[in-house]
Amino acid sequence: MFDITKRTTITTDWAQLKTVQEQMNLAEIMLEVGSEFPICLEADADNENDVFEQLTAQVVHVTKEGRVMVVVKDCMGQMHAMNDYATNEGGWKDSAMRKWLNEDVLPRLPKELQAMIVPRTIRQMIDGKEVQTQDKLWLPSFTEMFGADAAAEWAPGDLGDEQFELFASERSRVKEVPGRGTWWYWLRSPYASYSTRFCLVYSLGNADDGYARYAAGVAFGFCL
């Protein structure tokens, strides 16, 4: 005898999802780890590079407080650099990536989803000082991808993070860039060994790093 596992699909809309978020436990009722739902990025008429995109969002972790952490299953079509120059100075807080995600990408999400996103406190140790930001869109940290033990060497500046449940295996960390196949994508953590680099996830799902000014895949996250 053996079991056949089948996925269950729930038909819903943003209004119902928001009601569950406000009145019940979103993770228990609708969005457990591994759940997927579609989101779209509207085209920006003022920027020819910002075209309409259909993405799949995936629940990667649920916090002890019941907050649902979501990361897009594959990268956006548009790749982007962490900074305009090869530097990780200022970490996530001062990065061009952070500004781009929260000023350019966020407004392209459905208005109903924007209203549901909970700003998240990001903490990093930069040059011996704790730096905090409040962000609606963010990149995962090295710790959230690979765990605290590996981060002690690669990204000791990560503060208060824990590994996201879904990313415990290499296979779960592999992502594609549309039209390019499996690709490497950025993390928000400065690479500890070089001031010119940030950490990233290589195309095979393992840890790597890259020059901050190089364009790589972008798989952003948000909290519900």
List where the protein language model places each region.
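Collagenous Gly-X-Y triple-helix signature in extracellular proteins
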Residues: M1-L224
